[in-house]
Amino acid sequence: MSFTVIIPARYSSTRLPHKPLLDIAGKPMIQHVWEKAQQSGATRVIVATDHPEIEQVVTRFGGEVCLTSDKHNSGTERLAEVIEKMAIADDEIIVNIQGDEPLIPPLIVAQVAENLDKHQVNMATLAVKLTTREELFNPNVVKTLTDKNGMALYFSRATIPFGRDYFPQCDDAFVQQQNYLRHIGIYAYRAGFVKQYVAWEPTALEQLESLEQLRALWYGEKIHLDLAKEAPQVGVDTAEDLERVRQILNILCSQ
């Protein structure tokens, strides 16, 4: 099976300016993400960026990079530009990894590509089981649920499904006994579908929830969803996240 990883890497970030270039254990963050993608068995790994400085850094460490517009509203739009510029075949599997996930397990990068390859759908993603009450009611944790065939029914920042007879008194033990799922933001697409996806008008649901994947469900597409074989560790959204990741990678790199 052939698949291509595309890593969108935006230069601007409100909370962490120049985030992809921040140093972690002696390397820029984007290099750690690129190395994890390389370890997944991908046929090709492309960094998609809107800034020449990131382009130069990726070129220096030997990565393939595509300079894209800085006008995109989402990472998926950036993917579509790369697919068009690089003339990637419509049937190629594309895995989208965020550029702020330096601890992404290579195992699940390969897993989401394999899941798409095995199912007659245009999009696949992963989830892990929720284990705490705090996560269950946290709007920053995206919840999801599937039908009997492993197809996503919905994604929400709200608590789904809602246990009418158990909330809000439930505890961690209750959550662990149920099948509540936390969505992981890693996707596999068929390249031709990405071009269709960005051509669709944004929907009220995706705008209300601030969840772009709801566009696919709104337009009638199936999204395959499976439990990740390995739970990813923290991504880098804040300065606190950055320090945690630095501590983890400093330890790993010193072993």
UniProtKB/Swiss-Prot annotation:
Record flagged with keyword Nuclease: no
Enzyme Commission number(s): 2.7.7.38
GO BP: CMP-keto-3-deoxy-D-manno-octulosonic acid biosynthetic process; lipopolysaccharide biosynthetic process
Pathway(s) it belongs to: Nucleotide-sugar biosynthesis; CMP-3-deoxy-D-manno-octulosonate biosynthesis; CMP-3-deoxy-D-manno-octulosonate from 3-deoxy-D-manno-octulosonate and CTP: step 1/1; Bacterial outer membrane biogenesis; lipopolysaccharide biosynthesis
Enzyme's top EC category: transferase
Annotated family: Belongs to the KdsB family.
UniProt name for this protein: 3-deoxy-manno-octulosonate cytidylyltransferase
Species lineage: Bacteria, Pseudomonadati, Pseudomonadota, Gammaproteobacteria, Pasteurellales
Gene transcribed to yield this protein: kdsB
